[in-house]
Amino acid sequence: AVMGRNLALNIESRGYTVSVFNRSREKTEEVIAENPGKKLVPHYTVKEFVESLETPRRILLMVKAGAGTDSAIDSLKPYLNKGDIIIDGGNTFFQDTIRRNRELSAEGFNFIGTGVSGGEEGALKGPSIMPGGQKEAYELVAPILEQIAARAEDGEPCVAYIGADGAGHYVKMVHNGIEYGDMQLIAEAYALLKGGLALSNEELATTFTKWNEGELSSYLIDITKDIFTKKDEEGKYLVDVILDEAANKGTGKWTSQSSLDLGEPLSLITESVFARYISSLKDQRVAASKVLTGPKAQPAGDKAEFVEKVRRALYLGKIVSYAQGFSQLRAASNEYNWDLNYGEIAKIFRAGCIIRAQFLQKITDAYEQNAGIANLLLAPYFKQIADEYQQALRDVVAYAVQNGIPVPTFSAAIAYYDSYRSAVLPANLIQAQRDYFGAHTYKRT
């Protein structure tokens, strides 16, 4: 409800009159009462709401993904004309969007499945928007979407037509998977700095402030530096009294499931999903901590040197995560005939969304230099960083393993990097085993 309200207010602020409807009369009245003088027109029946709109109608749905979306669409259909446009801005599974697009197209309606990132504040002030569906329908709503979207530093709106049917929601799903990876990498950097150097919260804030001034500059690093110094009403550091169980809404899981369907090695992001799952086993972990043995973390040596190693490991880990995510976008584009523009996708992530970061411009540059590049690690800039930073990533992972600090995504990053640069892997033995017990055959070198 808050996302819908804030998007309505964002659209209204650009000079539009916006018809609003909610199943709950109270919620509709509440939005109007809280925003006096705004060009928001309340409606209390679906029929009245639909008939208030100019044709072709442009209806933005912001409802909980799943059955609720189908129910909302079904309630609208009796009052729609051919050519009307429904925009689903929810966190919808892309296969549902493909189905709805197919069904509504058959009835003469347009359907645009649209990823919206930026949370409640982004919805109000300018989100990153990822629309997919009929191109001609997108052209009719593009002027509004371009006005309400976030603006990158160069003034470009963070919205672009992504591709047919479920493409927009797929890109949003991968965005969310990358977000999981970014957050887990940062959490592991925090664990290393705390475990290896016993940095105080103030020192952590200072470190992250410095990091945010360089190549790691991003929304997530920016908010993390603030989190470290936030205190609760008792004067305790808030981060230290928050239970170490990370929840999830399932979008990271969808990204990993899709990687398995496509045969894509999305190892880092998948480890970040599993890290949340193992965090939720709090009671088991507490019990296991009293039974299972392992090393106690020893000091990591020179402070400045170790902080720099962790910074480098974090940046290279982030690059590996994005390389995997964009590789999966390429596989999905081929599978679903979307013809995705990867440089354009990186561009619309530059502002408004949770993963916004300075280095996204480097991804856009890489695809502009070579649109057909198989993997971002092969692009000149990222190859140079990998050359310079891979040793730091190795050192950090080795330290973590020797000292019993779990770093699943840092470990996944170096394992993927080494696997990807290996001309020969031991998979020949696996294939021989498969042939031995199952006559699966094999290819000779």
Curated annotation (Swiss-Prot):
Residues bound to NADP(+): A1, V2, M3, G4, N22, R23, S24, V63, K64, A65, N91
- SMART domains annotated for this entry? 6PGD (SM01350)
**Which enzyme class?**
oxidoreductase
User: Which residues are responsible for catalysis?
Assistant: K172 (proton acceptor), E179 (proton donor)
Binding of substrate occurs at N91, S117, G118, G119, H175, N176, Y180, K249, R276, R434, H440
GO molecular function terms attached to this record: NADP binding; phosphogluconate dehydrogenase (decarboxylating) activity
Pathway the protein contributes to: Carbohydrate degradation; pentose phosphate pathway; D-ribulose 5-phosphate from D-glucose 6-phosphate (oxidative stage): step 3/3
Among the record's GO biological process terms, what is one? Answer: D-gluconate metabolic process
Q: Which UniProt keywords apply?
A: Gluconate utilization, NADP, Oxidoreductase, Pentose shunt
- Pfam families under this entry? 6PGD, NAD_binding_2
Catalytic activity from the UniProt record: 6-phospho-D-gluconate + NADP(+) = D-ribulose 5-phosphate + CO2 + NADPH
Q: Which InterPro entries match?
A: 6-PGluconate_DH-like_C_sf, 6PGD_dom2, 6PGDH_C, 6PGDH_Gnd/GntZ, 6PGDH_NADP-bd, 6PGdom_BS, NAD(P)-bd_dom_sf, Pgluconate_DH
EC number of this enzyme: 1.1.1.44
Judging by the UniProt lineage, the source's domain of life is Bacteria
Quaternary state and interactors = Homodimer.
Say which family it is in.
Answer: Belongs to the 6-phosphogluconate dehydrogenase family.
Q: Outline what the protein does.
A: Catalyzes the oxidative decarboxylation of 6-phosphogluconate to ribulose 5-phosphate and CO(2), with concomitant reduction of NADP to NADPH.
Give the PANTHER family listed for this entry: 6-PHOSPHOGLUCONATE DEHYDROGENASE (PTHR11811)
Q: What is this protein called?
A: 6-phosphogluconate dehydrogenase, decarboxylating
